[in-house]
Structure formats: structure tokens, C-alpha cells
From Swiss-Prot:
UniProt xrefs under InterPro entries: 2-comp_sensor_kinase, HATPase_C_sf, His_kinase_dom, HisK_dim/P_dom, HisK_dim/P_sf, PAS, PAS-like_dom_sf, PAS_fold
This protein's name: Phosphate regulon sensor protein PhoR
Positions bearing Phosphohistidine: 213
Keyword 4Fe-4S: no
Gene Ontology cellular component list: plasma membrane
Membrane topology: Multi-pass membrane protein
Positions of transmembrane segments: 14-34, 39-59
Enzyme's top EC category: transferase
Chief localization: membrane
Source organism: Shigella dysenteriae
Domain Histidine kinase: 210-425
Localization: Cell inner membrane
Length: 431
């Protein structure tokens, strides 16, 4: 086993080199000349090894150093071992960087590494999507030149990173940006897309505002009549009118609460529990009778039902979806409208549809029809007792059955609501 170079080895090498000079000098004389020749030969040998080492270090790409003898052998062997260790460390460091980048790419947030001045030296893929960065084209670019927002510039310049920055991109996307010091004079920037959270917060505010608004009017009516009764007793027709109005408003509030509870129940229901066998044809026969009663012969109906077509699902949710679509057609179409209800087999499953030849719905309203409390004609909806929750209930109910609500409408020609229950949920004995 080779050991490191020592003084003993160097002195021994020098003595061995000079030994022939001593022997020859003892026999022939001229000892100084023989010693000079020996030392010169040793020097030339060292210079030759130095040139070989320099060639290997600067020119030769081989990992193995040139073979060495004497004092050069442990030196060259040590250099070779050091190179192997460095290669191993570089490989380990490369693997560590790969794991770090792989982990950073898996993060659900955009990650950017910059210098203290803002020069980018790395970013993950999500940063390219969310912040619009390009890698490696933007390497070395100042992030303030790429994200030109005054509040972002001020946030970086003040150096107060105790709170995140909420930034709005292009009036649509909301970002939450956090900046943390990262090693010496470097910054770690994490950007999270919180657009959906802002939308949910807005929906929550609108929901409570709408519920408050819907309850305020019937409560105001009830309060008004109660105050009238306190001031003077009501008799005859006035009393009957007051009781009738209070009863209507109470029923309206009760209906609103029931629909809110139904919507909450559907949203909270587990989607995987679709194991009930639902007799949709029988359900539609009940809905047909109720629709005829609700219509009071103002509309005409055609029910085209495949009596053998049954599905697996949640019966309460499907009943809510089907009845809401049919009752909406009755409540929101004028007298003389013809309503066609179909339950039939289609190539990809079982389709339920409600079609009418009424006035239709303007295109700008269609994307918002399934929002809670959204109404196309608010005055007419309140007159018919509509709460604006029916289509929201339908949307969530059909989503739980791996489907989606389709709405097609042409102004002046009519509207068609439909959804398709997928093939896998059709009962096996359905033809």
C-alpha cells in the first residue's frame, strides 16, 4: 500500500542516486564530477516527470495519471485518488441538485431563486406558467424587469417580508407571493395561485348577501302585518288577505330553507356511493302528474320515457335534478308553451332532457345560470316563487353522477336542458 511522500523517502532516493558516484569516484577519482553528473541526472528525471504531470493535467483527458517511479509514484497516486474523490463528490452533488430540482418541480407553487438585487438564477416549471418566466432565457435577468407591477417593486425594495404580497395579474389571476432570505445575499421567492380562493370568498360573500336579501322581504311583510295587528284588530277580508299573504311568505321562506338544505346535502354527499337502483321511469310518471298540476293547463307536455331504462345512483339527488328541470320549464315559460321531457338510451349512456319552445335565454346569461341565486328575470322569478337555487342543485346532483348539465338555447325558439348518465351507471337489466 502506497504511503504519502516523506523526507526519509526523498533522502533515500538522493542517496541511492549518489551511491554510484561514490563508488566510481572511489575507483577512478573525480568524485565531485561524478556527484554533479548524478545530481544532474536526478534533476533531469524530475523535470521529465514534471512535464508528464503537466501534460496530463492540461492536455490529456484520461482519468488515469501517467505511471511514476520513486518519489513520483505516491504523488501521482495521490493526485489520482483526489481526482476520483472529486468526481464522486461532483456526482453526489449533481444527484443532490437533481433531487432538489425534481422536488421543486413537484411543488404546487412557483419557486424562483434570485440574488439580493433580483437577478434570477433558477426557477421551476410552475414559475414559467404562473409568472410568465422563460428558462433558461431569463437566467440573469432582473425579476423587476419581468414583473412590472408597482406594488411588487415596492415590496422587494422595502425588504419587509414578514407578510405575503397579494398581487393581481391582468385583473384575473390572484397571486400570493412570499419572499425569504436564502443563503448569503440570495432570495427564495414562492408564488401561489389563489384565484380560486378569491373566487370562493367572493361566492361566500354573495351567498350570504343573497340569502339575507331573499329572507328580508318576506320577513318585512310578516313584520308589517304583525305591527298592523298590534295596532288594531283585522277583520273580514283584510284579515283573510293578511293571513293569506303571511302564509305565502312563510311558505316561500320554508321553500328557500329546504332548497338550501338540499343543496348543502348534495354538496356534502360522498360521490362514490352510487349503489342505489333508481327507477327513473316511475319517478318521471310522478313528476309528470305534479307538472300537470303545477301548470294548470297553461302548457302542454310530451313525456317520452324508456320504461326499461334504470340506473344506479342516488335517488334523492336524481329526483331533485329531474324535478327541478321540469318545474323550471313550467315556471319560466309562458302560457301555450309545449314542453318535451325525454328519458332515453344514447350511445354513451342514458340521457334526460327537458326541451321547450318558449322565448329562450340570451347567450350572456347561460354561463351563469347554475350560480346560486342567479336569475334571468328577477321580477318573474319572485312572482313564481323561484329562489335561484334550482339549477345549482341540478348541477351538483348530476356532477355526483359523473355527468354535467348541458344548456342549449336560442332566443325566440326555446331552451333545452340535458345531462347524460354514463354507461357504467346503467342498471344491468336495462335494455
Amino acid at each position: 500500500m502506497l504511503e504519502r511522500l516523506s523526507w526519509k523517502r526523498l533522502v533515500l532516493e538522493l542517496l541511492l542516486c549518489c551511491l554510484p558516484a561514490f563508488i566510481l569516484g572511489a575507483f577512478f577519482g573525480y568524485l565531485p564530477w561524478f556527484l554533479l553528473a548524478s545530481v544532474t541526472g536526478l534533476l533531469i528525471w524530475h523535470l521529465w516527470n514534471l512535464l508528464r504531470l503537466s501534460w496530463w493535467l492540461w492536455v490529456d483527458r484520461s482519468m488515469t495519471p501517467p505511471p511514476g517511479r520513486g518519489s513520483w509514484e505516491p504523488l501521482l497516486y495521490g493526485l489520482h485518488q483526489m481526482q476520483l474523490r472529486n468526481k464522486k463528490r461532483r456526482r453526489e452533488l449533481g444527484n443532490l441538485i437533481k433531487r432538489f430540482r425534481s422536488g421543486a418541480e413537484s411543488l404546487p407553487d412557483a419557486v424562483v431563486l434570485t440574488t439580493e438585487e433580483g437577478s434570477i438564477f433558477w426557477c421551476n416549471g410552475l414559475a414559467q406558467q404562473i409568472l410568465g418566466l422563460r428558462w433558461p432565457e431569463d437566467n440573469g435577468q432582473n425579476i423587476l424587469n419581468l414583473l412590472r407591477y408597482p406594488e411588487f417593486t415596492q415590496y422587494l425594495k422595502t425588504r419587509d417580508f414578514s407578510r405575503p404580497l397579494n398581487l393581481v395579474l391582468n385583473t384575473v389571476r390572484h397571486l400570493e407571493i412570499r419572499v425569504m432570505p436564502y443563503t448569503h445575499k440570495q432570495l427564495l421567492m414562492v408564488a401561489r395561485d389563489v384565484t380560486q380562493m378569491h373566487q370562493l370568498e367572493g361566492a361566500r360573500r354573495n351567498f350570504f348577501a343573497n340569502v339575507s336579501h331573499e329572507l328580508r322581504m318576506p320577513l318585512t311583510v310578516l313584520q308589517g302585518y304583525l305591527e298592523m295587528m298590534d295596532e288594531q284588530p283585522l277583520e273580514g277580508a283584510v284579515r283573510e288577505k293578511a293571513l293569506h299573504t303571511m302564509r305565502e311568505q312563510t311558505q316561500r321562506m320554508e321553500g328557500l330553507v329546504k332548497q338550501l338544505l338540499t343543496l348543502s346535502k348534495i354538496e356534502a354527499a360522498p360521490t362514490q356511493l352510487l349503489n342505489e337502483k333508481v327507477d327513473v321511469p316511475m319517478m318521471l310518471r310522478v313528476v309528470e302528474r305534479e307538472a300537470q298540476t303545477l301548470s294548470q293547463k297553461k302548457q302542454t307536455f310530451t313525456f317520452e320515457i324508456d320504461n326499461a331504462l334504470k340506473v344506479s345512483g342516488n335517488e334523492d339527488q336524481l329526483r331533485s335534478a329531474i324535478s327541478n328541470l321540469v318545474y323550471n320549464a313550467v315556471n319560466h315559460t309562458p302560457e301555450g308553451t309545449h314542453i318535451t321531457v325525454r328519458w332515453q338510451r344514447v350511445p354513451h349512456g342514458a340521457e334526460f332532457s327537458v326541451e321547450d319552445n318558449g322565448p329562450g335565454i340570451a347567450p350572456e346569461h347561460i354561463p351563469r345560470l347554475t350560480e346560486r341565486f342567479y336569475r334571468v328575470d328577477k321580477a318573474r322569478s319572485r312572482q313564481t316563487g323561484g329562489s335561484g337555487l334550482g339549477l345549482a342543485i341540478v348541477k351538483h346532483a348530476v356532477n355526483h353522477h359523473e355527468s354535467r348539465l348541458n344548456i342549449e338555447s336560442t332566443v325566440g325558439k326555446g331552451t333545452r336542458f340535458s345531462f347524460v348518465i354514463p354507461e357504467r351507471l346503467i342498471a344491468k337489466n336495462s335494455n
